[in-house]
Amino acid sequence: MKKYLLFLLTMTLFARSEAFEINKDIHEFAANMESCYGVPASKVEWWLYGTDIKELALNRTAKPTEAKPWGEYKKLFITDDRIRGGLDFYLANEGDLIRAEHQFGVSRYVIAAILGVETNYGKYQLKLRAADMLATLAFNSPNRSAFFTKELQWLFIIADREDVDPLTYKGSYAGAIGYPQFMPSNFDSYGVDFDGDGKTDLVNSMTDAIGSVAKYLSGHRFIFGEPIAVQADVSGDTWQKYDSRSMRPLRPLKELTDNGIIPRGDFLPDTKATLYTLDGADGKEYWIFFNNFYAISRYNPRVNYAMAVFSLSQEIEKAVDWANDEGVYAE
């Protein structure tokens, strides 16, 4: 009996020690929120004590879907259902998409594709609390704690400013919010009241989501009418040195073509470009990325993500052209 009581006492002390460490982190975070951003520490602590640690956040960020080979990842998004959904979405929101294209200089098909990849055009039912995910990753992520701490700060800043309970924000396993899956810092920087109702609502207003995606891409130097990406053929023995594994276009296209990297299309020779090799379903695929591809990658810095958006945008555009030819309209 004494040994059992000693065991219970030891476990209790251990539990208290673990809780103390968590509380200490929370106190420091809350104090910083008040001193740096004016959000009362007591309010921040109350919010944090209402959050739950979610193993899902740690597991999914450690093994993101985007890490799959392109040939596998492509099958998740370039499907008949996703393309048909993109056509339906476009027809239902054409006015807002065209207005966003004109105002921000961003392809309406790319805007639609991002919303298609992020939340299947708003059809996904977001059930996870963004505060749970961000708090878990801020206090427990071994590699990206600083990033998620910043995003948790922004979530609380926005909630305090808008007088909203942050525990009501629904999001992804990484804490992204609403139809466009904006991280809280992007919500603040690029959120747009595109429907003119006096507030930016990325959770319930698809019009606001469309404008916000366009503003984000415009802010990352997407330029309407310029190329995004094109598949290429390679030959010779010098092209390999240009396979940079970087999505940032830094060399003139002519330098690539002079070294056996030939785009499947006509482009201005001085256009900045980069070569990237992907593992496709049928083997290696060679792609030339331009500035607009890099702009898309700023939404999510994984090449598979940007490729999915680019590919889906092309399919949506083809579907819209078909619908226009056939006289198909939104129901």
Language-model segments: residues:
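Functionally critical loop-and-helix segments that line ligand-binding/catalytic clefts
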Residues: 181
